[in-house]
Amino acid sequence: MIFVIDCHIPYLRGVLESQGHECRYLEPEEINASTVRHADCLMIRTRTRCNSTLLDNSAVRCIATATIGYDHIDVDYCHSNGISVISAPGCNATAVEQYVDAAIRTWLKKRHINKLPIVGIVGVGHVGTLVAKRWQDYGAQVLCCDPPRERAESLTDFKDIKQLAENCDVITLHTPLTHHCEHATYHIVSDEILDIFSGNNKLLINAARGGVLDEESAIRHTNIDYIIDCWEHEPDINKTMLQHCFIGTPHIAGYSAQGKANATTMIVRQINKLYNLGLENWAAPYQRSRTISDYDIMADDRALRDAPNDFEKLRSNYKFRE
């Protein structure tokens, strides 16, 4: 088989080659219709948009993204053209939860807030569940909003997003990015919700997906603090939004060594199930780097403010936590 692989996916070099497969490691901007034309499988990250422009007239039959989400992949196109889509749900949930914990605690300290906030969580999946547990363990009141889960599981204690805006000090977003469907999340937080939420000592965190928060609306609501890791129009982020942020980071909330190892392991094993590559027991090795107790979120904020045009470079060269 021929694999075209984003060269920034860690732990992969030599793994598939050891089983006799051809691997071409490319920068994200080098993955295009020409370079994927003869590939059987793509192994990518969110920087690669997989749609008809990339895939028409190609040999690709499998796309594996080493990320929890797949809104960068035209799933309908893939399904209608016999292309399997693989992702790594939950791979970096612990890392994102730790980022959110560090973000809220940094905000409380810098704003000299000495009481536990009421925390609202929008999207209670892998990450949101961990965030809820952390802050409940601290003794904080936690309100959860997740309409699909609420309906599917007949949950009675979940709230709608307006109730979170009315009652919470902190709202943190952990949804996928969806369009044109029931409970679509595109711009789920815009003027209406921000009007309700506005006030002193209010914090909104987006470590979910760019586009869940309407950044133009956020810029108009100046009395809310924003901690933004996921931005609209990445890597060409809104510089005004960055200036407006309490903390801004270059989409690295999920960047831990363990999270990256988990993602690589998950997609390799799923590809193995499809193609019987002899890698059913393979696991990516990783070595611990910085621990969360050492993590200085303000250092990541400074790096982005110093070089906002280097957004992708900051991501690609980021030293993994944990």
Predicted feature descriptions by range:
Residues 201-322:
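Rossmann-like dinucleotide-binding domain for NAD(H)/NADP(H)
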Residues 97-112, 137-140, 265-274:
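Oxidoreductase and adenylate-handling cofactor-binding alpha/beta cores
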Residues 50-51, 150-239:
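Rossmann-like adenosine-cofactor binding region
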Residues 1-39:
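N-terminal glycine-/charge-rich "phosphate-binding" loop or analogous flexible N-terminal tail
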Residues 6-7, 89, 97, 115-136:
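Glycine-rich adenosine-cofactor-binding loop
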Residues 137-155:
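NAD(P)-binding Rossmann-fold cofactor-contacting core
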Residues 57-62, 81-84, 140, 199-203, ...:
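A short helix->loop->beta-strand "cap" motif at the edges of active sites that frequently abuts
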